[in-house]
Amino acid sequence: MSTAQHTSPRTYEVRTYGCQMNVHDSERLTGLLEDAGYVAAPDGQQADVVVFNTCAVRENADNKLYGNLGHLAPVKAATPGMQIAVGGCLAQKDRDTITTRAPWVDVVFGTHNIGSLPALLERARVQDEAQVEILESLEVFPSTLPTRRESAYAAWVSVSVGCNNTCTFCIVPSLRGKEKDRRPGEILAEVEALVADGVSEITLLGQNVNAYGVEFGDRQAFSKLLRACGEVDGLERVRFTSPHPAEFTDDVIAAMAETPNVMPQLHMPLQSGSDKVLRDMRRSYRQRKFLGILERVRAAMPDAAITTDIIVGFPGETEEDFLQTMHVVRAARFSGAFTFQYSKRPGTPAATLPDQVPPEVVKDRYERLVALVNEIAWEENKRLVGRRVELMVAEGEGRKDAATHRLSGRGPDNRLVHFAPPAGVEIRPGDLATVEVTYAAPHHLVADGPVVDVRRTRSGDAWAARNAAPAPSSGVTLGMPTVGAPAPLPDAPACR
């Protein structure tokens, strides 16, 4: 702690780990800090305030946090006035131990009171002692807080927070609480305001997004919300994540198929293809229901790309159980999957289940699963060679774009496509480019032919306006990309 006085604006950096909810929460943390007078630390410069927005779903989340805190200890000791704050799910879980294991931490705050961060930082500075404040229920719905959006053309929009499911492997509901829903009018007002600012793609976000409406008793609230988004003038693309198979109903499928700006893309977490394992996981669906949902989605939207989450090595999983998962992967023909080796989390029912699977068995099954997922994804991508696709061009999409002199974007189905921009034509993030796919790989497509068409958009204008004036770096380091960027494996899945 330090009582050093500061005459210039204090700088900040937010480091984010985990799911999309954390990415969006970090946009709010950034907005709160800037609203309180902090400025983003320029690239390469040590920030006065470093905020960790943490994840608690997987075991390596703990190791990652405390490892990073350890690296900062000597930096803080040599930097008068520097402060470190830890928030998010791991802070909610480890509230009593963080300042014991890392006594140089100044502030610990939870998932329910992110709006308190600026006040807690100031209190820690003035009182010269650590401030630990964890609430057990939501203080203010996060959507009311100041937000600094990372993208000029795409945005997260929360429809709910919390989760009412009780999956035995997941600790998130105990950390984020029961589901609380925003009212449709409030959500649509935010969407319309974003579009007015130049956003043309939104992703509706919830721990169990299609359960939206349970709090106010409307079982079709989510499908109605999708259709209402279709009426927002200027909104090009609507996506959502993540649904739960148990509540995924035919009215949602119909709304997706019948609303032109709802994209033909679905992320539907499987977790396991074994009915026995699904029962042990307390997932309230079985293999037949899951495959039936996918069949109805593809009947309504033949070109839909479907991705999933799969956990390998859940306690009690036998070779036959695993083969059932492989069967579902073959039948479902996912365009991609986030695959995870089961991680025991203290405080979850699964942590105490008998028959924990040996690590070497889990590793073998994981490698076989990944190989199959990649094989199928590649086959599905090859079918798109020769097809024309309209891409929303995005910033920071391809790691090799600078070396290959390409740009990157996402198709309606959310597949990543790298393409060669035409000479003499400015194509900005947020603009729409139509290309013809010439090459397929398991995780991306390439369009090396001429660009068929470019449509300049209000989102491209917004991106250009944001980047016209010199500005410091965003101050946010994301464990996952911003909306519109490619989707590599996240640190952990959301509660789904």
Curated annotation (Swiss-Prot):
Residues 149-380 form the Radical SAM core domain. Catalyzes the methylthiolation of N6-(dimethylallyl)adenosine (i(6)A), leading to the formation of 2-methylthio-N6-(dimethylallyl)adenosine (ms(2)i(6)A) at position 37 in tRNAs that read codons beginning with uridine. It catalyses: N(6)-dimethylallyladenosine(37) in tRNA + (sulfur carrier)-SH + AH2 + 2 S-adenosyl-L-methionine = 2-methylsulfanyl-N(6)-dimethylallyladenosine(37) in tRNA + (sulfur carrier)-H + 5'-deoxyadenosine + L-methionine + A + S-adenosyl-L-homocysteine + 2 H(+). Residues 382-451 form the TRAM domain. [4Fe-4S] cluster 2 binds at C163, C167, C170. One of its GO terms (cellular component) is cytosol. Residues 465-496 are annotated as: Disordered. Monomer. It is found in: Cytoplasm. Its EC number is 2.8.4.3. Residues 10-126 form the MTTase N-terminal domain. Keywords: 4Fe-4S, Cytoplasm, Iron, Iron-sulfur, Metal-binding, S-adenosyl-L-methionine, Transferase, tRNA processing. Pfam families: Radical_SAM, UPF0004. This is tRNA-2-methylthio-N(6)-dimethylallyladenosine synthase. Its main location: cytoplasm.
